[in-house]
Design a protein with these regions (language model features):
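Acidic, surface-exposed loops and disordered segments
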Residues: 1-196
Length: 196
């Protein structure tokens, strides 16, 4: 039995992939292969999107020079643990339709689907992913060459092989466990959202 299985219990018969995947901070510094990185983005490529606009953009760092630049975008507690990740990814959502210039209302939703596809594929490869809101969003545009007029900075992602909890700063040891989820009954309602 894995730690995930000991802590998490599905309420329905879902694929174990959904329950076993969790967002580790402890990541091994071992580099990922070009083939592994390609597979992650191939999974993201096949995510569904409204009108097939595929509004996501991923800028990643896996080489020493680009990793050094990417680490400067981390902030807060993320600096302490994510700096050792062998792959850092920054995710953006396109703001406007490429043909009409109209706002893409579903861009963030669709970009989230692409990130989820990447995360599940990473788990299938024996890798761990952790999304980070704690990045210098305002600096991502210039440092990564992404036009702010066209894209919105969403998240950073640290990716790597699972590492040892003891590699983390002591204050993060207790938090390095899979967490639980709300019951489906708390967020899925047939017909109408009930009055509270």
């Amino acid at each position: 039995m894995t730690i995930s299985q000991a802590i998490r219990r599905a309420e329905a018969d879902v694929d174990p992939l959904f329950v076993e995947r969790w967002s580790r901070r402890a990541l091994d510094e071992r580099p990922l292969s070009r083939a592994q990185i390609d597979v992650l983005f191939e999974a993201a490529r096949w995510a569904p999107s409204a009108n097939n606009l595929q509004p996501w953009l991923f800028v990643y760092a896996s080489e020493p020079a680009s990793l050094e630049r990417a680490r400067s975008l981390l902030k807060g507690n993320n600096i302490a643990w994510a700096s050792t990740a062998p792959l850092l990814v920054f995710v953006f959502a396109r703001k406007k339709h490429p043909d009409t210039g109209a706002p893409i209302r579903t861009a963030q939703f669709d970009t989230g689907a692409a990130w989820q596809s990447l995360a599940l594929q990473a788990h299938k490869l024996g890798l761990s992913t952790r999304a980070m809101g704690g990045i210098h969003h305002d600096k991502t545009y210039e440092l990564l060459g992404v036009p702010e007029a066209d894209y919105e900075s969403m998240i950073g992602i640290a990716i790597g092989y699972p590492g040892e909890r003891e590699s983390l700063p002591p204050e993060l040891h207790e938090r390095e466990l899979p967490n639980q989820r709300r019951s489906v009954r708390e967020f899925a309602f047939e017909g109408r959202f009930p009055a509270r």
